């Protein structure tokens, strides 16, 4: 983080996965304590304090839906029950065998865990509650905690509201209309084609439908990849008036600021690109996206217009962009 600041990155938000003893996607909802091998609570506080000294924000990854059999307090009575009385389970993620925690109980675990984090002097700025906004609402038929899908969404929102009440900015995987009142930002909200192979056919013309409704309500970070022989994803970040990802994938090459010349040059270029997107986001982040056009009917030339008059035009033929503020370039 210090190296990135030295390179001119400006204010950053550090999202940390796998920070607790069980490891990433393991042991939820009994995720604490902080990983001993990484310095434990003392080391975690030191990291958070170092971020704050530089004016940066710090947030954690957490999870209150996947319910791992290896969790310290695992009790099958707390799990979702399907209409036929069975308990769903799979072993897809790193933590192995799991079911789903009934959301009626999730707020209790959130209160317990975040209260414990605070007792160690760790002042979280943000928290990412994984999967809540990318999975449909669960139904539960357990007689002790029956739940409809609407009630599931209400309990998930209660988790977000608890964090907000304690000064912690809320985040989850994607964006959903039910979560808008209690969600500050998300992991991402990519177009469908951005989740597929670059050579895969696209299922239509990508347009910012969600942002035409909710742009001023939820901050959306955008991928900044430049696809060889394809699109520069930075253009979609600009069209949507979003925030940029500087580093999205964990990597060991730059650990402890030890960057070789090639990596440093690439990072410097990434910082310059992110500065453009971040600058626009500072201007329009709280503005409504009021219009989006295919310029001249050409789907590869798109323009977004924000409530303050800022217009962003992206030409995907040439992979270029133009930002005009109230008619001036």
Predicted feature locations:
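Aromatic-lined carbohydrate-binding/catalytic grooves of carbohydrate-active enzymes
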Residues: 1-112, 120-127, 131-145
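Active-site-proximal substrate-binding groove within the catalytic cores of carbohydrate-active enzymes
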Residues: 71, 79-94, 101-127, 131-329
